[in-house]
A protein has these predicted regions:
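Hydrophobic pocket/interface hotspot
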Residues: 36, 40, 46, 70, ...
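Intrinsic-disorder/low-complexity, polar/charged segments enriched in Ser/Thr/Lys/Arg/Asp/Glu/Gln
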Residues: 20-26, 33, 57, 69, ...
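Hydrophobic ligand-binding cavity/cleft-lining segments
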Residues: 1-56
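A short, structured loop/turn motif at beta-sheet edges
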Residues: 33-34, 65, 88-93, 115-124
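Hydrophobic/aromatic beta-strand elements that line small-molecule binding cavities or substrate pockets
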Residues: 26-27, 59-62, 82-88, 99-100, ...
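Beta-strand/loop substructures that line and gate deep hydrophobic ligand-binding cavities in soluble
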Residues: 22, 96, 100-150
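A conserved amphipathic terminal alpha-helix motif
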Residues: 1-8, 131-166
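Short beta-edge strand/loop motif at the mouth of beta-sheet-based domains
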Residues: 24-25, 44-82, 166
Length: 166
């Protein structure tokens, strides 16, 4: 268990590495690492919180284990898109997976998520996405991803508070 810092990450901090095509997201949750892990690996829970509130998520394929794959469709009345990837490592404190937006199938990102127990009922989620190019990274950042990340994490806060990830 690590020490809690004085920095406040109750809203997501999204940073681009100037030297690498990397996006880093840091966010603290009033949750245990086990609750966050479950919310990221249980397809029913994942579909309830991921993405912006204006979009619903339908899980098409989900096998959250080393070597497993996933695919989901995000849609609203006037819009539909799909994402897919493979789980490379799934452990209670770390998930490593690929992430591909099917509209750009050649653009594959390698994502690493870690769940750090801060004590006192708080866990820090760190997500790092190594994107295939600086252009791809910058396109992600300008796509409105910040809204989707923050709205999704707010929904995750509610899901955890309701006890759904226990």
């Amino acid at each position: 268990m690590s020490q809690t810092t004085s920095e406040d990450f109750t809203t997501a901090r999204i940073e681009a590495d100037p030297a690498l095509p990397v996006i880093r997201i840091t966010r603290d949750f009033r949750a245990t690492p086990a609750q966050l892990f479950r919310a990221h690996t249980d397809p029913e829970l994942f579909a309830r919180w991921v993405g912006p509130t204006s979009i619903s998520t339908e899980i098409d394929q989900w096998d959250a284990r080393d070597g497993g794959s996933w695919r989901y469709v995000a849609r609203r009345e006037d819009f539909e898109t799909a994402f897919r990837g493979c789980f490379h490592q799934v452990t209670p404190d770390r998930i490593v997976q690929t992430f591909t937006w099917e509209e750009q199938p050649d653009g594959v990102a390698l994502e690493t998520l870690t769940f750090e127990d801060l004590g006192n009922g708080w866990t820090r989620l760190r997500a790092q996405s190594l994107v295939d190019s600086f252009e791809g990274r910058d396109a992600w950042l300008s796509s409105g991803m910040e809204t989707g990340v923050n709205e999704g994490y707010a929904a995750l806060d509610e899901l955890i508070a309701d006890g759904a990830a226990d």
